[in-house]
Design a protein with these regions (language model features):
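Short, charged recognition helix plus adjacent turn
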Residues: 1-5, 13, 17, 56, ...
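Hydrophobic side chains within well-formed alpha-helices
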Residues: 7, 11, 61-62
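Short basic helix-loop element that most often maps to the first helix and adjoining turn
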Residues: 9-28, 53
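DNA major-groove recognition helix of helix-turn-helix/homeodomain DNA-binding modules
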Residues: 30, 49-64
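Recognition helix of helix-turn-helix/homeodomain-like DNA-binding domains
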Residues: 31-45
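Short, basic-rich loop-to-helix N-cap that marks the start of a DNA-contacting helix
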Residues: 43-53, 72-73
């Protein structure tokens, strides 16, 4: 049985909003399209290095990548 990862709600949302294909993002980040799909759908969780790459690529926080929501300071 494959281990379940954390679903990256913001990642899929950002990619769709920007009109980017999984293949384009995967190629830009030097990963497989399948790996990106697994991250988006929670079949695999990215390590910290990949979270930082994704965060930099989309210019958003890691929190946003995971939740799809902006966090505001109180």
């Amino acid at each position: 049985m494959e281990k379940e990862g954390c679903r990256m709600l913001g990642l899929k949302k950002l990619r769709a909003e920007r009109g980017l294909s999984q293949l384009k993002v995967a190629m830009d980040l030097s990963i497989s399209r399948e790996a990106l799909s697994y991250y988006e759908n929670g079949r695999r969780s990215p390590d910290l290095q990949m979270l930082l790459k994704l965060s930099g690529y989309f210019n958003v926080s890691i929190d946003y990548l995971i939740t799809g929501r902006e966090f505001r300071k109180a």
